[in-house]
């Protein structure tokens, strides 16, 4: 893909080196951008300093995690709400949460949306599911011709669970869906919801194509929050969602290749950021979330190959406060995630760098299957509304429909 505007977040070799030194990764990013940005398979752990979407072929034993959103409910331009995009060398793609604002970063990667059809909710706070509608409709517009599959926990009562959330949201944008039927593949409008017991302990919620995803309870606000692990081809990624430090995460994340867990602002920094009194900030940071020193204790117990913290706004002062807190209790490999950070994981390497994306990324090309997928009749306004069309304008003739090759 030829970039049409100055790419953002391309910090070059120096930034890649700084990240490598900070986290203690086993391979450093090198300035060897593939010629012409053609898709190539990386050899010997020598990666370009920045990740350019669709220029690298994942190895058969490689996964790539992109942080689409790492911030707070009050999103900023540089830190939208929580979402992680996981791509495997077998072609499978998974979303863990889809918080408000995160779809913009997803679409900037220009993935094959026919394969972006699975999203796993950790819980139903808006900063974790707020872009659900955008994912459903935007992915449908961009190449998904099958139902969007949603996996998520039950709640303490039926109306607080994932199934009720999805059903109610679909009712809320029923008008939108009906206007697009006919122009877009019919099946892409559908939603396939799998709700599971939030208290199940490391049980399988998804198992297909050699991929196993398990869930266990998280402790956050109300009953109905979970964490996940994804295992494939001898690699393990863990997504914590939002949670107070808990025994389930420590047990089931143990030894993960990449363990992600919130590293929330410490109380004083949180009080300053929101203008709260210290009591309120302390309660939120240390009773509902996981503050940095507690994150460090969790990671010291889990001992992952690499620890990934998120759920903050990494202004210089906040970044310093979080790092200092974590390093009082954990001295292992660490990255504090910012939006569009990319982590490649193999059995030999873990490489951390930034994505370089176009501010005006075009939608990805769609597959032939998408073009040929069944569609119902186009929708239009009623006769009484159409009667109001202005006779001062005549639209151009419709082109002939393309023929199958």
Predicted regions: what they are:
Residues 2, 29-237, 320-350, 367-369, ...:
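Binuclear metal-dependent hydrolase catalytic cores
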Residues 2-14:
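Bacterial N-terminal signal peptides that target proteins for export
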Residues 12-22:
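Bacterial N-terminal signal peptides
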Residues 24-27:
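Juxtamembrane cytosolic interface motif at the C-terminal end of transmembrane helices
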Residues 30-31, 227, 233-236, 244-341:
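Cap/insert and terminal regions of metallo-dependent hydrolase folds
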Residues 352-366:
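A polyampholytic, Gly/Pro-enriched intrinsically disordered region
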Residues 372-376:
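Protein-protein interaction and targeting regions used for scaffolding, dimerization, and localization
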